[in-house]
Amino acid sequence: MEERYGKLAIANLLTSIWFGDWKRYEEIMEDVPEPLQQELSFHSFYKRDEVQLWHDNHFFIPGDHFVSPYFSSYPTNSGDEEDRRKDLLCLIGLYEKTGFYYPLEQDRFPDHFGSLTAFLSSVMKEEIEAEQEGDSQYLEQLEELEADVLHQYIQPVIRPLLQQAEMKVKHPFFKEFLRFYADMMENGWVEAAE
């Protein structure tokens, strides 16, 4: 149960960064004990005004420093543009099927990395409830859903995202954040689930 709460906190933190919700980021970090804050390498570079400006430059305003925050912008091993379009439609269907309307409420596209991590947060909340209620069958379904989202939508585009960011991301907060995000989604998330 403790791991689920930890993953939920991390997913909420990642979501706040992807969406540039600095008020929420600061609220979350206030609750993080100092020793754990030091493990979040990006946090030592946090200066709200700078980070807010560079967030817009990196993830919102197209230009020299722009890095797309949308999974459908990146090629995957298997795919052409048609495959990415199908993946996007499947993701939208998944959101509708589970009643996840956060991207619409936030006026964001469903394939935004912030939307994906917000969805993982939503799944984590459901997992916590299922575990508390002793509903092992529902918990297993949720764990499979969580793994599917990671394997189908996030992990295949981590390397292309980092390659694009390598030359464009200048601010150390975001350099460290992207490294942390990649490591968490490729390794840490899975380890925390086990």
Stretches with model-predicted labels:
Residues 1-194:
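Surface/interface-facing alpha-helical segments and adjacent flexible terminal/loop regions used
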